[in-house]
Amino acid sequence: MRPVVADPASDAVFWPEGFTLAGINCGIKPTSKDLMLMLCDEPASTASVFTTNLCCAAPVELSKAALSASGGKMRAVICNSGNANAATGAAGMQNARLMAESTAQAFDLNAGEVLVASTGVIGQQLPVEKIAGAMPSLKATSGSTQWCDAAEAIMTTDTFPKAFGVDVKLSGGTARIAGIAKGSGMICPNMATMLAFLGTDATIEPALLQELLAAANAVSFNAITVDGDTSTNDMAAIMASGKGPEVLRGSDNARLFGEALRSVMTMLAQLIIVDGEGATKFVELRVTGAKSNEEARMAAMTVANSPLVKTAIHGEDANWGRIIAAAGRSGASFVQEELSVYFDDEPILKPGLDANFSEERAKEVMSKEEFTITLSLGKGAGRATVWTCDLSHGYIEINGSYRS
């Protein structure tokens, strides 16, 4: 199902208690918002996942260390856009520390309680003095409902801010989970995300929160791809303010909370695909009949990342050969004569390499903004679902001049 962009004024958006947010321009970008704060009233149980890229950015290294040293208790996230502070050496690490320190000083925190994130151009030193100088404005404009301002401040090539939240009824009351995310290109996470910051007012221990975040991440942000590139700065973090009902390991509350967290993260992930650089189509790719779920995921991500598949999607060409060729190099086990391919409910390839399909009906499916490709490997019960988009001329236009 194609996700719908959340209206920040709508009752469909639920903001959890115990958080203050802000999004302003600090001067890294000429005019648009480029500095975001998410602050919890009290030390919050915090969990995070980070990029696995070996060229990880200074703020990723700093935030990993801070979260570990804190025992999973943090107070704030500070994030700038327009500059990644990646591949910047010792000076970049010092600038990341200064981001944390200036935030801590402005909001009466310890620097070790601040997660730091950055996104933008790689290899340029961060003008951290602009961030430090903007702290009074950040503080003056902060509030409990400024989630969409915060979402706007972390955008780079995004065309709209991404924010979403839900209520979840638990034993002991109702908890809220909300999040913001950014991402449009360089999207192919690997045990991490792009940038996503979530908050909940549930009461939950850091270790359990980390487990639930990792599980939700595996089927949301780790199940999307725009271009096959894993960023140097990917990070997803969630803070729990403890203002709401308690979530204990092994309880019904833990199951319900985990499902709600997964729904929020899935919506944010799908919004990233909708906003993929130059994208005109949103495609759900399902792989069934694999030997295992892991093999299904291998096949799904390989097909979803294939430039030939993605350009065929853009051109509305039912080139099933590209799909099975991509699956064939994925490492998943199958016999090609047992494969089948469907576009929505329309059979394109049947077992026995029977490709006697209706070009007209296939074109009708592919002309839609949203459709599903199902690839069955015919080997077992393993399955996986990922989301991707087409690859258009617009992607080249955006990325051919990103630094200019």
UniProtKB/Swiss-Prot annotation:
The keyword Cytoplasm applies. The active site is at 193 (nucleophile). It comes from the Bacteria. It is found in: Cytoplasm. Substrate binds at residues 156, 182, 193, 277, 399, 404. The record marks 192-193 as: Cleavage. Pathway: Amino-acid biosynthesis; L-arginine biosynthesis; L-ornithine and N-acetyl-L-glutamate from L-glutamate and N(2)-acetyl-L-ornithine (cyclic): step 1/1; Amino-acid biosynthesis; L-arginine biosynthesis; N(2)-acetyl-L-ornithine from L-glutamate: step 1/4. GO terms for biological process: L-arginine biosynthetic process; ornithine biosynthetic process. Keywords: Acyltransferase, Amino-acid biosynthesis, Arginine biosynthesis, Autocatalytic cleavage, Cytoplasm, Multifunctional enzyme, Transferase. It catalyses: N(2)-acetyl-L-ornithine + L-glutamate = N-acetyl-L-glutamate + L-ornithine; L-glutamate + acetyl-CoA = N-acetyl-L-glutamate + CoA + H(+). GO terms for cellular component: cytoplasm. The record marks 119-120 as: Involved in the stabilization of negative charge on the oxyanion by the formation of the oxyanion hole. One of its GO terms (molecular function) is glutamate N-acetyltransferase activity. Its EC number is 2.3.1.35, 2.3.1.1. Heterotetramer of two alpha and two beta chains. Catalyzes two activities which are involved in the cyclic version of arginine biosynthesis: the synthesis of N-acetylglutamate from glutamate and acetyl-CoA as the acetyl donor, and of ornithine by transacetylation between N(2)-acetylornithine and glutamate. This is Arginine biosynthesis bifunctional protein ArgJ. It comes from Chlorobaculum tepidum (strain ATCC 49652 / DSM 12025 / NBRC 103806 / TLS). The gene is argJ.
